[in-house]
Amino acid sequence: MKTYGTTQGQIAFAASKNHFHGSLNEKAQYQFEVSVEDVLKDREISYPLTRAMCAPIGDGAAAALICSEKGLKHFPTEIQQRAIKIKASVLSGGKYRTPQETGLSRVAAKKAYRQADLEPKDINFVEVHDATSFCEIYQLEMLGFCEIGTGGKFVEEGHTQLGGKLPVNLSGGLVSKGHPVGATGLSMIHELAVQLRGEAGKRQSKRNKIGLAENGGGVIGFEEAACSVIILEGSH
């Protein structure tokens, strides 16, 4: 915040936006809206974070059926038509980094873009691991959607909300959808699949050909111990 000028208000905007998205998700843990003002007024956890900026731990489960293109042909036509293609799947391990170094998700994202033969501008919508709402701002920068230090402004300008140029965490993110820990990563994949199939209802992204999910866990110094970036493409 001191280096790049990211504000508490911008973090609150990200939180409020995700609470709105969560209010449209019948599977979200928190299905209510929270204004930017109320996010800022909420109980402080550790400055600049208030309670409404932090993900709640909750129960949950998620599953996915994965098969080869050849194996898909053995399924009924209606299932084949709903299949989602894995364009890239990358898992990167962390190391001790200084606060000045780019994060592990930048490493994983670059590999994923190469694997998928895509660029950040090709991604239509994103799910990121927002254990806190600051994480969303940070990951937008690491994933290459905006320049380092400009994530807060990018969010505040409304680009990441439903109907924006890059909708982020249409599920509500961890902050609103909830953080079922072991099921969190796969729940992001579920949201991508729902969006790619055009089945997200009121929170449906208009542009829904290609989606990206970033998930991280563990800690090494200032960094995640592991990070995955997955890019999926719809069949339409």
Where do the model's predicted regions map?
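Phosphate/pyrophosphate-binding loops at sites that engage ATP/ADP/AMP, CoA/4′-phosphopantetheine
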Residues: 1-7, 109-122, 200
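Short glycine-rich phosphate-binding loop at a beta-alpha junction
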Residues: 122-128
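Short glycine/threonine-rich loop-to-helix capping motif typified by GTGT followed
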Residues: 97-102, 130-153, 164, 180-182, ...
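Condensing-enzyme catalytic core mediating Claisen C-C bond formation in acyl metabolism
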Residues: 13, 44-111, 115, 157-171, ...
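Glycine-rich, mobile lid/loop segments that gate access to catalytic sites or pores
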Residues: 1-48
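Acyl-CoA/ACP chain-elongation machinery
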Residues: 15-29, 93-98, 132-138, 182-193, ...
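A structural signal for well-ordered alpha-helical segments within the folded catalytic domains
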Residues: 9, 103-107, 186-190
